């Protein structure tokens, strides 16, 4: 860890605009050739452009980046491509295998960062990675969303005229996975993950969370706001908030990148009289430990 933190990191923006153009290329093209084809099985994947933008802005080569719920390893892969070291944790064994294959693939493509990977419950991350306490420059992660925002289809054109089939939109049936918890359980578990991850931060390190509003039984839920409140209860203070575009930008207009099922759910909500819109961005929330801010006064 060759970079010594400075006071400026507490307010560092690295000249980022408030709206990040992270959807210029479709997600499929962002991953093509950089991740294994099997990675598409995961129901919720962070855009590689979001991960690389955050890592490039808030860390230096040689720094440590951690993702406590790493999925297919997007955060880790982008980190080691940018000459950062990475450590990740994933609950489901099958996804750990996907992450490991992606990391090996990254090294085969010339990535030089080192990595560590563990299979387990992210609520125990501070114990599993106790040797990393006080060393991470950045924790970058995202909570799981509902299955209505994820998945791929086989249309009637692909399956001989049959019905539209949805696949790759669910996690395993293991009830220990936070994706299966009610909203209160999800937030409680995510709060414990944030608290544990904060213990791994070096002084003035950053916790970054990507999150979007969701609908539960038709009701729009301000999940970003709830994550901010949850973080505050666990000693993390919101420092910055950005819009990371899922859509593209062309000639001052948005280019739709919405998935089939996001559009379908939006139409269904509108048919029920709900003023629903397809999501064009994720909130990127940056936090610092309250203790770091207090110590700087």
Question: What would you call each of these model-derived segments?
Answer:
Residues 1-297:
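Class I S-adenosyl-L-methionine-dependent methyltransferase catalytic core
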């Amino acid at each position: 860890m060759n970079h010594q933190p400075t006071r400026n990191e507490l307010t560092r923006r690295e000249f980022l605009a408030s709206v990040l153009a992270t959807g210029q290329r479709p997600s499929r093209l962002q991953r093509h050739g950089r991740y294994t084809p099997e990675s598409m099985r995961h129901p919720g994947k962070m855009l590689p452009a979001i991960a690389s933008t955050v890592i490039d802005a808030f860390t230096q080569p040689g720094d440590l980046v951690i993702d406590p719920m790493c999925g297919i390893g997007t955060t880790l892969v982008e980190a080691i491509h940018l000459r950062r070291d990475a450590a990740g944790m994933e609950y489901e064994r099958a996804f750990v295998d996907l992450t490991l294959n992606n990391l090996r693939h990254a090294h085969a493509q010339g990535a030089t960062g080192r990595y560590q990977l563990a299979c387990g419950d992210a609520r125990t991350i501070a114990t599993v990675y106790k040797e990393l306490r006080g060393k991470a420059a950045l924790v970058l992660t995202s909570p799981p969303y509902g299955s209505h925002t994820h998945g791929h289809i086989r249309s009637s054109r692909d399956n001989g005229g049959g019905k539209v089939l949805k696949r790759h939109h669910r996690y395993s049936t293991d009830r220990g996975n936070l994706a299966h918890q009610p909203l209160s359980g999800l937030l409680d578990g995510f709060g414990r993950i944030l608290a544990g991850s904060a213990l791994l931060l070096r002084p003035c390190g950053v916790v970054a969370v990507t999150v979007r509003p969701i609908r539960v039984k038709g009701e729009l839920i301000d999940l970003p706001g709830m994550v901010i409140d949850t973080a505050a209860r666990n000693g993390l203070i919101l420092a910055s908030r950005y819009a990371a575009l899922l859509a593209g930008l062309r000639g001052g207009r948005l280019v739709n990148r919405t998935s089939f099922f996001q559009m379908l759910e939006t139409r269904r909500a509108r048919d029920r009289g709900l003023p629903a819109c397809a999501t064009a961005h994720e909130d990127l929330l940056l936090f610092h430990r309250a203790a770091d801010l207090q110590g700087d006064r």
